[in-house]
Structures are given as structure tokens and as C-alpha cells.
């Protein structure tokens, strides 16, 4: 397209400016409920069935984070090979989910977990291990007990 035609089109579309009529730009506000209704109607077309009794869903990502759904609504259409999981999702690090998630990990995740496990003890030891200098400073902060306070309180009571 040549530059002259493009300049004419741009001049026609100009919004605002001195002496020109302003063209209102339409703004479409989408709400979550509208999106949810569209999603539910699409799922209804796929003939999904509700799956009851699922307490939690964990989706493990490659970067070591887990998308965790607690008490989700799970719908499935086996003919369309489609699963829909709706509910409140939380992104958590895999280390936070560790004891209960081990049975759900695949071979890929187990190798990445081993690497994480090798790094984790080093980080914990580096951050939590008190240095000998720190121990001495903590002792200096606590004053030594010089008097017996029990005798003073007994004298005040009499």
C-alpha cells in the first residue's frame, strides 16, 4: 500500500484534535461470568460428564511449580479427549507440596526433584546455620542474673 493512501486513512481515523469531531471508541467490557457462561455452553456441546469425588488436582509444570486445585469441579468428555477443571487455583512451589505429591510425580518430575533435593539441604544449611560469631553476640545481649528476686518479693509481701 502506498504512503499517500495510508496517510489519508490515518487522517480520517484521527481521534480528537483541534476542530475535529471526536469519534467514540467502543470499549468492550468482558466479565468473568460472561466468559464462564461461554465456557459452560462450549462444554455442554462436547457432552461432558461431571466426575464426583475428586478432592484435589495438581498440575506440575516444567519449572518446578504446581498448580493446585482444592475441591475442584471436574468434567470430562472421553470422546473429545477433554477434561475441564474449574475452581480456585493456587500456584505453589513443588517443595511446599512434597510429602503428599510424591505418588503423583512421573519420571521427569522425579529427576528434577532429585536435583532440587540436592540443592535444598545446601540452601537450608547456609541460611540457618549459626556462625560462631553470632552465638557470642546473642550471649552478650542477655544480662547475667545478679540478685535473687524471690526474696525481695517476699519482703514486700510482709
UniProtKB/Swiss-Prot annotation:
Residues 33-98 form the NAC-A/B domain. The keyword Coiled coil does not apply. The modification N6-methyllysine is found at residue 5. The modification Phosphothreonine is found at residue 111. SMART domains: NAC. Coiled coil: none annotated. Residues 122-158 are annotated as: Disordered. It holds the Pfam family NAC. InterPro entries: BTF3, NAC_A/B_dom_sf, Nas_poly-pep-assoc_cplx_dom. Residues 134-150 have a biased composition (Acidic residues). Keywords: Methylation, Phosphoprotein. PANTHER family: TRANSCRIPTION FACTOR BTF3 FAMILY MEMBER (PTHR10351). Belongs to the NAC-beta family. This is Transcription factor BTF3 homolog 4. It comes from Homo sapiens. The gene is BTF3L4.
